[in-house]
């Protein structure tokens, strides 16, 4: 690999803005904000709008669109 062309890979904290859930992971994202976590270390902070803690698919609060109405309308329209 060429030296000096790759971004720095380091541990950062992603924080869900909705639920304020925080998790540490590796990333090359840059941030001016920092946060001190429970382990006593200071990490760059990256705020996200949606994470697995607030997304309806992962929380089980997802609403499924019912296709029954469309099927019933189709069958009624083309019923012989």
Swiss-Prot record:
Coiled coil ranges: none
GO cellular component, one term: ribosome
Subunit note: Part of the 50S ribosomal subunit.
GO MF annotation list: structural constituent of ribosome
Organism: Exiguobacterium sp. (strain ATCC BAA-1283 / AT1b)
This protein's record includes keyword Transmembrane helix: no
Tagged with keyword Transmembrane: no
Top-level taxon of the source organism: Bacteria
Protein name in UniProt: Large ribosomal subunit protein bL31B
Keyword annotations of the record: Ribonucleoprotein, Ribosomal protein
InterPro entries, per the entry: Ribosomal_bL28/bL31-like_sf (IPR034704), Ribosomal_bL31 (IPR002150), Ribosomal_bL31_B (IPR027493), Ribosomal_bL31_sf (IPR042105)
Gene Ontology biological process terms in this record: translation
Family listed: Belongs to the bacterial ribosomal protein bL31 family. Type B subfamily.
Pfam families named in the record: Ribosomal_L31
């Amino acid at each position: 690999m060429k030296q000096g062309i790759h971004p720095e890979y380091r541990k950062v904290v992603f924080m869900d803005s909705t639920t304020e859930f925080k998790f540490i992971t590796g990333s090359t994202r840059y941030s001016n904000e920092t946060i001190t976590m429970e382990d006593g270390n200071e990490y760059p902070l990256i705020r996200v709008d949606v994470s697995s803690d607030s997304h309806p698919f992962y929380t089980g609060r997802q609403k499924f669109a019912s296709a029954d109405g469309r099927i019933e309308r189709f069958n009624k329209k083309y019923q012989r």
